[in-house]
Structures are given as structure tokens and as C-alpha cells.
């Protein structure tokens, strides 16, 4: 066991997570169509503060993230402060770590708490795949800049004459890695082939995710952590996530064609997480500040770790790299965990990480560790389903996982929970949570 790194303030306070909330998650182009991420962020933070009954002036910092950023609101965190009635003097800044963005936001607020610069803060993230920054071609962009500087109409017309019809076509946001040109699904296909993960295994995991998420909603387990969203024109509220397929069968999954490697692939739209709109946030405080306010924490942040690997091959192995580091810093092993919640970007990615967490060879030859991190106990793993079912608004997923895991730990009488995710750029994130 390596060095344990206690997450405490200078006064010995633990980092308490006192509350968490999210919007329902909606598939791209459905319930939240036309609602930008900044409005989703305002929606969830405003409701979180109202439900917690914590005076707005108590919150000293807000760290929020957005992956698909809109040019008109580059600092989503500050816009949320200004749009929710929070104290205008509240420190607010934005972060981005791809699919681990709200993990980063939580870590940043925790670090401010440990440094003693604040005693309470909000962390979270929001993304919209329905309101996108549709751009223009590089040639058109250059001409528009030059036209703005031109002094005469003839100069402007001469500049516009350089353009062709193809230069006027809108340019959608990139879906591939900037460094490699690979799409996430291409990497998932790599991983399926590298680790021998079959189409049947992927479909089975996806089906499990949807069944468990549907059961969680049916049992009322999510009602305290998901707000009702009232969407213009306010005729019909969104109460639950609208991606979950509770009545599907394995035979339904088998009907879909591969989405990335059309000829030999196994990754489909059904065994991948969909493009999604939504927002989520958590309130963090020092343990003593929570006691002063008479608040009972949902739980505590025990440790966290971020890692990075090469992006050319199997880059979605973040959980296999970050989990052993987070456990080491918490002074725990896999067997100490009550729950394990892993982000399901793709079923192939999830199954590959599970495989490597239990691999002695991977531990020795790749991580340089003496032993495997540990086998993943299926009875502890994604017990309420995962991102394949709920959806994945990139910057919101981490906060969803944290809140969901802490509530489930309480239902089980407390214990330790691991939340972990892969992210674009070969990044990984893991956090160990504790509930009493």
C-alpha cells in the first residue's frame, strides 16, 4: 500500500458533500431541444439551493464545467451565479476535463476547502447536445475577419468573390479526437478487439444497465436526487430520464448494425451511451461548517485521482489507471468497497476496464504494481444502471454518479463507494466516497 493522503482541512475537517441534484437527462433533440447548457445549469443550481434552504451568501465559490462550450457564454459558472440570485461576489470559474469535467469541479472546490480559502462551494456541470456551436469553414471565417477590416464596398465584394459554395456550408462540432482523428466509437472498437469482448457481452451489459435504471426509477430511488424540469412553453414537465428502455429485450439489441466499424464492428448505438442534455451539481462544505448550519452530510470525499495515457490505442482505460491510485490514497482496497460506479461510455470500454482491474499482468507490466487492483464484484457494480441507460451530458455525469452513489450507500447502511470514469484525451478520474 502506498501513501495515504487524507483529504482534510488544516483544522482536520473532512470534506463533506451535503447535497446533490440533477435535471432529468434527455436524449439529444428531445425534451431539452433549444435549451442551452447555461440555462440547464441555472435550473439545477437554483433548485439545489432552494431545496437545501442554504442561504445564498453561504456559498463562497462555484466551479462549473461545460464540454461543448458556447461562444456567447464562455464562463458558464459566472453566468449561473448571475442568473440564480446568488451573491454577486461569489467566486466563479469554469473547468473542462471532457467526460470527467464535474469530477474536476468537485476536486477544485475540495482543494479550496482544504486550503481554507472557502468553507462552502458548489461544483457541477452541464451540457447540451441539442444546442451546439455550429461553425463556419476556415476560409469563410478568414474572409469575414478581413471584410470587417475592409474600408470600401469594392474591397468587401472582392473578398467575398473568393468564396465557393462549399465554403458557405455550416461546420458541425468535431466528434473526433483532435490529436488522432479517431472517434470515441473507434476507440471502443479497438478495445473490443484488443480484449476479446464480444457483441453478446456488450449487449448484455447494455441491457443490464437499462433494466437496473428502469428498476431504480420504478422503486423511487432517484426521486430525491432528480428535479422536475419545467421547459418552455411550460405545458409538460420532464420528470424522468427519457433514454431508459425498460421494456427492451436482448433480441432488440441484436438487431442493430455496428455504428463505427460497419463491416467487422460490435459497437452499436444500443451498447453505447447516447448524446444527451442535462445538468448536475453538488454542494460541498467543511465538516464543521455543515455542523454550524445544522446540515447532515450525504457523505464525504475520501480521495481522488486523475490519470492520463496515450491516445492512439485503447485510450478509454482511465478507470483501470485512476482507480488503484484513488484507492491507495484512501488507504483502501477493492474488497473494502460497498459500491462501484463506473461511467459507461461504451459497453466495450466498461468491460475492458473491468477486465484490467482484475488483471495481474496489467498491474505488473503496465502499472508497475505488485498486484492487480482487484476483481469487480458484480453485486456491487453499477447497481442502479449506468450512463448507457441514463445518458451522458458530458460535464454532468460525474456529479450524477457522486450523488447517486452516496444516496445508495445510505440505503445500504453506509460504507465506501468508488466512482470512476474515462474521458477524451486518454484521461481518467476516480473518487472514493464515504457515507456513515
Curated annotation (Swiss-Prot):
One MF annotation (Gene Ontology) recorded for this entry: acetyl-CoA C-acyltransferase activity
Record-given protein name: 3-ketoacyl-CoA thiolase
CDD domains per record: thiolase
Summary of the function given for this chain in its UniProt record: Catalyzes the final step of fatty acid oxidation in which acetyl-CoA is released and the CoA ester of a fatty acid two carbons shorter is formed.
Record PANTHER family: ACETYL-COA ACETYLTRANSFERASE, CYTOSOLIC, ACETYL-COA C-ACYLTRANSFERASE
Any single GO CC term annotated in Swiss-Prot or TrEMBL for this entry: cytosol
Family: Belongs to the thiolase-like superfamily. Thiolase family.
Residue positions of the active site: 99 (acyl-thioester intermediate), 392 (proton acceptor), 422 (proton acceptor)
SUPFAM superfamilies per the UniProt record, alphabetical: Thiolase-like
PROSITE patterns, alphabetized: THIOLASE_1 (PS00098), THIOLASE_2 (PS00737), THIOLASE_3 (PS00099)
Pathway: Lipid metabolism; fatty acid beta-oxidation
Catalytic reactions of this protein: an acyl-CoA + acetyl-CoA = a 3-oxoacyl-CoA + CoA
Keywords: Acyltransferase, Cytoplasm, Fatty acid metabolism, Lipid degradation, Lipid metabolism, Transferase
GO biological process: fatty acid beta-oxidation
Subunit composition and interactions: Heterotetramer of two alpha chains (FadJ) and two beta chains (FadI).
Compartments reported by the entry: Cytoplasm
Originating gene: fadI
Taxonomy of the source species: Bacteria, Pseudomonadati, Pseudomonadota, Gammaproteobacteria, Enterobacterales
EC numbers for this chain: 2.3.1.16
Amino acid at each position: 500500500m502506498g501513501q495515504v493522503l487524507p483529504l482534510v482541512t488544516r483544522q482536520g475537517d473532512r470534506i463533506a458533500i451535503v447535497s446533490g441534484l440533477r435535471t432529468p437527462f434527455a436524449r439529444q433533440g428531445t425534451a431539452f431541444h433549444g435549451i442551452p447548457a447555461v440555462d440547464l445549469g441555472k435550473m439545477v443550481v437554483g433548485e439545489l439551493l432552494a431545496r437545501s434552504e442554504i442561504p445564498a451568501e453561504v456559498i463562497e465559490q462555484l466551479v462549473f464545467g461545460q464540454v461543448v462550450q458556447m461562444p456567447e457564454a464562455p464562463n458558464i459558472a459566472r453566468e449561473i451565479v448571475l442568473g440564480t440570485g446568488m451573491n454577486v461576489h461569489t467566486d466563479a470559474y469554469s473547468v473542462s476535463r471532457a467526460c470527467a469535467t464535474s469530477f474536476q469541479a468537485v476536486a477544485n472546490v475540495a482543494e479550496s476547502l482544504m486550503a481554507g480559502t472557502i468553507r462552502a462551494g458548489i461544483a457541477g456541470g452541464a451540457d447540451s447536445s441539442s444546442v451546439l456551436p455550429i461553425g463556419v469553414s476556415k476560409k469563410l471565417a478568414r474572409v469575414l475577419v478581413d471584410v470587417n477590416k475592409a474600408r470600401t464596398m469594392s474591397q468587401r465584394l472582392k473578398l467575398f468573390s473568393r468564396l465557393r459554395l462549399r465554403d458557405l456550408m455550416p461546420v458541425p462540432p468535431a466528434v473526433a479526437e483532435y490529436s488522432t482523428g479517431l472517434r470515441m466509437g473507434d476507440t471502443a472498437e479497438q478495445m473490443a478487439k484488443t480484449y476479446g469482448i464480444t457483441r453478446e457481452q456488450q449487449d448484455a451489459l447494455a441491457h443490464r444497465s437499462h433494466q437496473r435504471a428502469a428498476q431504480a426509477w420504478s422503486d423511487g430511488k432517484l426521486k430525491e436526487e432528480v428535479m422536475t424540469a419545467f421547459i418552455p412553453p411550460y405545458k409538460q414537465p420532464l420528470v424522468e430520464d427519457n433514454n431508459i428502455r425498460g421494456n427492451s429485450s436482448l433480441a432488440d439489441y441484436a438487431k442493430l448494425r455496428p455504428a463505427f466499424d460497419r463491416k467487422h464492428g460490435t459497437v452499436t448505438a444500443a451498447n453505447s451511451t447516447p448524446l444527451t442534455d442535462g445538468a448536475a451539481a453538488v454542494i460541498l462544505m467543511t465538516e464543521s461548517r455543515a455542523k454550524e448550519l445544522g446540515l447532515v452530510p450525504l457523505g464525504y470525499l475520501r480521495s481522488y485521482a486523475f490519470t492520463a495515457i496515450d491516445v492512439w490505442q485503447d485510450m478509454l482505460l482511465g478507470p483501470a489507471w485512476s482507480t488503484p491510485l484513488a484507492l491507495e490514497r484512501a488507504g483502501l482496497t477493492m474488497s473494502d468497497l460497498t459500491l462501484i460506479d463506473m461511467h459507461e461510455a461504451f459497453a466495450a470500454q466498461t468491460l475492458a476496464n473491468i477486465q484490467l482491474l482484475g488483471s495481474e499482468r496489467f498491474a505488473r507490466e503496465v502499472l508497475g504494481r505488485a498486484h492487480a487492483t482487484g476483481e469487480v464484484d458484480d453485486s456491487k457494480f453499477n447497481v442502479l444502471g449506468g450512463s448507457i441507460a441514463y445518458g451522458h451530458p458530458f460535464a454532468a455525469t460525474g456529479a450524477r454518479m457522486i450523488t447517486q452513489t452516496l444516496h445508495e450507500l445510505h440505503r445500504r447502511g453506509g460504507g465506501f463507494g468508488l466512482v470512476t470514469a474515462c474521458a477524451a484525451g486518454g484521461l481518467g478520474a476516480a473518487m472514493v466516497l464515504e457515507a456513515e
